[in-house]
Amino acid sequence: MFSLLTAAIAPAMALLCFFYLKNEYGSQTLGFVVRTFLIGALLMFPVMVLQHAFLAEGFFANPLLKAFILYGFFEEFFKWFMLYFFAYKHVEFNRRYDGIIFGVSLSLGFASMENGLYLIANGVETALGRALLPVSSHAIYGVIMGYYLGRAKMEEKHRKKWLVLSLFLPVLLHSLYDAILLLWSKHFLFVMVPFMLVLWWVAIQKVKLANQLDR
């Protein structure tokens, strides 16, 4: 059980530390970061129940509908909703990079709980693949969501545009990720590897830009 718990949480902790330490202009209190992580972990349960309910009723049988609505939209919308109401309006959210920290923290909380349940069902031997793909992809969605929420918080003139992008882009990227898995199930790595490399490049650029704008 200890090894399974470690395998479920360790990738998220490593990624969270990576992005936390990338903050060049101050750091957030760990207490609030942990709080957003736990909110993300708890959020996974109602989202999972909702997804299973729709699947049980025969909705979203089409792979593209499943990828874009059931997985991409549902998961990213609820993460965005919780991030907006629990972190965006908080006094500690006072830099653009804070959005990245909180977005990554909440997303990795969600991914850790999802990862733990998957490992319980499928065995700890699947942990490496889970760390490299689903967990890291959730971190990247959190970076992008948080980056644009940070822009919205600090740049009132274009707030609506940044808020829309903070939801739309993570939904789009998450949906494309799941579409690759569903449509290219046997040979998905040929598409997924370049896709993930592009996602990581985008995430690192957002990290650099957020730090530059916070100067």
UniProtKB/Swiss-Prot annotation:
What kind of membrane protein is this, topologically? Multi-pass membrane protein
- Family in the record: Belongs to the protease PrsW family.
- Keyword Hydrolase tagged: yes
Instruction: Indicate the secretion signal residues.
Output: none
Q: Name one GO molecular function term.
A: peptidase activity
- Look up keyword Membrane and say if it applies: yes
For this protein's source organism, the top of the classification is:
Bacteria, Bacillati, Bacillota, Bacilli, Bacillales
Protein name, UniProt field: Protease PrsW
Which parts pass through the membrane?
A: 1-23, 31-53, 100-121, 130-151, 180-203
EC number, UniProt record = 3.4.-.-
